[in-house]
From Swiss-Prot:
Probable component of the MCM2-7 complex (MCM complex) that may function as a DNA helicase and which is essential to undergo a single round of replication initiation and elongation per cell cycle in eukaryotic cells. GO terms for cellular component: MCM complex; nucleus. It catalyses: ATP + H2O = ADP + phosphate + H(+). It comes from Oryza sativa subsp. indica (Rice). A motif (Arginine finger) lies at residues 508-511. Residues 326-532 form the MCM domain. Keywords: ATP-binding, Cell cycle, DNA replication, DNA-binding, Helicase, Hydrolase, Nucleotide-binding, Nucleus. This is DNA replication licensing factor MCM5. It is found in: Nucleus. The gene is MCM5. GO terms for biological process: DNA replication initiation; double-strand break repair via break-induced replication. Belongs to the MCM family.
Length: 729
């Protein structure tokens, strides 16, 4: 049988991937050569809807990277896109090799046409992937997705410094000085170093020992690597659960493109790494992370991007904006289960829509976000409003003042356990960038923590200079805060200064300040009681209609989103002139009031308040999708400003003026008794003094009013949280 195979040539494809096709049949899978060829054909020959060659042109104009849509790969070759989805770690390096080769051939052709034969620039081309598929939930990603392509959305809460990651490590044998280069696994993977040297010893030569290799850093090849921490979007976290985090690894041209607080949509390879080598018996337990191969920053207040409005939705929104009762209808959707408070609802509607951001020629940014403070008695639905806004705003973070520190609200510097380096982690004001921060119990915050949000409220940035990290984070958020007066309830016998225990610096940053009082009126109490009983009685029926309510909330959320993205109104000339006159008039009234009472207003009326009225006017125009704010919008903005901030500034000031002769006489008698009871410099408990004068037949409210007037004349002073009175004169 000799010579039976003469003349035939047999070969084996050594480049076959280690994984075979289904059933272990290698022929059913793509070979390395055929995959490389198909990738080249795709980059060269794929045509867009207009007949152009998008990827070929992209490579010529940008030699470093090219973004490939998986949907285009699907249309070109379904098998190829399937391989990219299921085995991205194997096929993406091939794709990048194909891109480098296509770029080299294209550049040599371009050089040939000009008549100058240049050597084509060789270099690695990074492939970025993009997809229009829906994002997976962070909680749903498990072992089934290992080594596959996944797409998730979230908000960046931390970013590490850039490190150098070796792609090829050069090893030197300590014994025979021979050199070997071994590749490194991409992402957070390391290199596999052989135990023995390849050198064959000569007769009489001592063989190389085990583990003879030492790394030569100067001869190794590196790429930039950065790790990010991605957290679930606040609106996606189930109630009562902590938000989940995912570690991301970005390299080459993706490093230093993301700052904490940025909302991202990420495509990457779900991988694992060994977190710590010190854990005994945990060799098989690995930590998951995502090696990013494509990311997209979400625009404005929408984690899915603003382009996902259908034509039907846009038509519906535009029709709604043309309705004469659009403003009233929107306000009725704010807190529908809350009775009354129509002006507060209108203010919250303005806060949700926001004004227009502006950038001046000298680079200064003027904020468009509106801040609202609700100050008043308990059980006046303040927290209900905050909870409603948290559900309705496209981006919202809810926090309580007592449980919030300065670092938790702004940003903290944390030391990484493994690398011992510091990195930034954004707080509530950073995470809500482009949305609303709801702060309950605002008055219970420590003053040093409250000061931390001054810059975030006006300049819309947070400056950090800690542990060698000096940076500025964006914090373009609206603040909706709720607070109680000093004594828990608003005391009409006290001035606004005595009721509001907040500094002027923080009060001037709020555009609207509402004093919400629990007024005891028979008819109103009856209507409120009837409304609350109906809400509770129809609870069972309402649960079946819950879908309708949630649909209404979703519609409002989408409408707010659409208005914020598409409409940027500006003031008309008539509106600007009217605004100027009204502002000067308000300042004049406040100056006159301060002159009459001898005390400055508790809530200052400054240029910030003028800007607040401009923002309110723009917000009212934005609700109607109009590009110009008219005098009618300015009129309504002034009305809101008058019933909130101006009323709050005036409240309690003239309480002791224009008293009836009988009451004035009683107050004088009370003052005389107080002076007889207390010598100059002596002190007494307020409660004890009131009880003693009560036993003498004096009304408690008269005694309190007398103390208030004496305090204003600086004759008595309060100490120990207003529990003790000291007579001064």
């Amino acid at each position: 049988m000799s010579g039976w195979d003469e003349g035939a040539v047999f070969y084996s494809d050594q480049a076959q991937f280690p994984r075979g096709g289904p059933g272990g049949d290698p022929s059913a899978d793509l070979t390395r050569h055929s995959a490389l060829r198909k990738f080249k054909e795709f980059l060269r020959g794929f045509t867009g809807p207009t007949g152009d060659f998008p990827y070929r042109e992209s490579l010529v104009h940008n030699r470093d990277h090219v973004t490939v849509a998986i949907e285009d790969l699907d249309a070109f070759d379904a098998e190829l896109s399937d391989k990219i989805r299921k085995s991205p770690a194997d096929y993406l390096p091939l794709f990048e090799t194909a891109a480098s080769e296509v770029l080299a051939s294209l550049r040599s052709k371009v050089a040939g046409e000009t008549g100058e034969m240049e050597e084509p620039a060789s270099g690695d081309v990074q492939i970025f992937l993009s997809s229009k598929e829906n994002c997976l939930s962070m909680r749903s990603i498990g072992a089934d997705y290992m080594s596959k392509l996944v797409k998730i959305a979230g908000i960046t809460i931390a970013a590490s410094r850039v490190k150098a990651k070796a792609t090829h490590v050069t090893l030197l044998c300590k014994n025979c000085r021979s050199v070997k280069t071994v590749p490194c696994r991409p992402g957070l993977g390391g290199a596999i170093v052989p135990r023995s040297c390849d050198h064959v010893p000569q007769p009489g030569e001592e063989p190389c020992p085990l583990d003879p290799w030492i790394a030569v850093p100067d001869k190794s090849k590196y790429v930039d690597l950065q790790t990010l921490k991605l957290q679930e979007n606040p609106e996606d976290v189930p109630t009562g659960e902590l938000p989940r985090n995912m570690l991301l690894s970005v390299d080459r041209h993706l490093v230093q493109t993301i700052v904490p607080g940025t909302r991202l949509t990420v495509i990457g390879i779900y991988s694992v790494y060994q977190a710590s080598a010190n854990q005994k018996g945990a060799v098989g337990v690995k930590q998951p992370y995502i090696r990013v191969v494509g990311l997209e920053q979400s625009r404005d207040a929408n984690s899915n991007g603003p382009s996902n409005f259908t034509l039907d939705e846009e038509m519906e929104f535009k029709e709604f904006a043309q309705r004469p009762d659009a403003y009233v209808k929107i306000c009725s959707m704010i807190g529908p289960s809350i009775y009354g408070h129509s002006d507060v609802k209108k203010a919250i509607a303005c806060l949700l829509f926001g004004g227009s951001k502006k950038r001046l020629p000298d680079g200064v940014r003027l904020r468009g976000d509106i801040h609202v403070l609700l100050l008043g008695d308990p059980s006046t639905a303040k927290s209900q409003f905050l909870k409603f806004v948290e559900k309705t705003a496209p981006i919202a973070v809810y926090t309580s003042g007592k449980g919030s520190s300065a670092a938790g609200l702004t940003a903290s510097v944390i030391r990484d356990g493994s690398s011992r380096e510091f990195y930034l982690e954004g707080g509530a004001m950073v995470l809500a960038d482009g949305g609303v921060v709801c702060i309950d119990e605002f008055d219970k915050m420590r003053p040093e923590d409250r000061v931390a949000i001054h810059e975030a409220m006006e300049q819309q940035t947070i400056s950090i200079a800690k542990a060698g990290i000096t940076t500025v984070l964006n914090s373009r958020t609206s603040v909706l805060a709720a607070a109680n007066p000093i004594a828990g309830r608003y005391d009409d016998l006290k001035t606004a200064q005595d009721n509001i225990d907040l500094q002027t610096t923080i009060l001037s940053r709020f555009d609207l300040i509402f004093i919400v009082k629990d007024v005891r009126m028979y008819d109103q109490d009856k209507r409120i009681a009837s409304h609350i009983i109906k809400v509770h009685a129809s609870g069972a029926a309402a649960s079946s209609k819950n879908t309708d309510a949630s649909e209404g909330e979703n519609w409002l959320k989408r409408y707010i989103e659409y208005c914020r993205v598409t409409c940027k109104p500006r003031l008309s000339e008539k509106a600007a002139e009217m605004l100027q006159n009204k502002y000067v008039e308000i300042r004049q009234k406040m100056r006159q009031q301060a002159h009459e009472t001898g005390r400055a207003a508790a809530i200052p009326i400054t240029v910030r308040q003028l800007e607040a009225i401009i923002r309110l006017s723009e917000s009212l125009a934005k609700m109607r999708l109009t590009s110009v704010a008219t005098p009618e919008h300015v009129e309504e903005a002034f009305r809101l400003f008058n019933v909130s901030t101006v009323d709050a500034a005036r409240s309690g000031i003239n309480e002791h003026l224009n008293l009836s002769p009988d009451i004035a006489n009683e107050i004088k008698q009370a003052e005389a008794q107080i002076k007889r009871r207390m010598g100059i410099g002596s002190h007494i408990s307020e409660r004890r003094l009131i009880d003693e004068l009560n036993r003498m037949g004096m009304n408690e409210s008269i005694v309190r009013r007398a103390l208030l007037i004496m305090h204003q004349r600086d004759e008595v002073e309060y100490k120990r949280e207003r529990h003790v009175i000291v007579r001064k004169a």
